[in-house]
Structure formats: C-alpha cells, structure tokens
Amino acid sequence: EDNAVALDIRLENQWENGVIKGTFQETAFNKDGKFNVYLMDKVRALAAEESQNIEIVFISHDGETAAILGNAFAEDLGFKNVSVLKGGILQWLKEDRKLVSHKKDN
C-alpha cells in the first residue's frame, strides 16, 4: 500500500537471511532479550515523516512478536493504523515470496 510503512522487528542475525524489499529494520529486542527502546523512536519518526495517517506494518519471524508489539503500539501509545504481517517472514516464504539482501548501511 502507498500509505503503509513496513518495519521488520526481527533480530539482526535473522535479517542476514534476507528482508522484504522496501522495509525498514529495527530490532524489537537485543541479543540478551531486552526490549530495544529505540524501536519506539523509529516508529514515531516513521509516523511523523510519512504523516500520522500512515499505517505501520510490523513484521516478525512468525508474526507473534509483531502481534504483541502492534497491539501495544495501538493500545498503549495511541497509534491508530497499526497492523501485522500475519504469519511473519515464515508465511511470506511459504507463499513463495522473495526476500532481498539486507544492507548494513543505516
């Protein structure tokens, strides 16, 4: 969709297997399992950059983490247009969709 921004919240080492073209990457948790506080800043920046009406689509490995975080951003932080890639990257690949190489330039 033109008014959607996709945010891949998987771990960095999972990005090495590829990412969905056009997505932004910001891991939800660090290697120790602690929440990445910069994720909130990234989502706010994307929403402000694109306009508050933008839809933020969270992408995780299997969709579960994305669903939990998407719900938190919608309910606790007041983001109106939040959704999740159902089934995550696993479902994406099951549907024979492509991934592109992750570039470590940001």
What is the meaning of each model-derived region?
Residues 1-4, 12-57, 61-106:
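Rhodanese-like catalytic fold shared by cysteine-dependent sulfurtransferases
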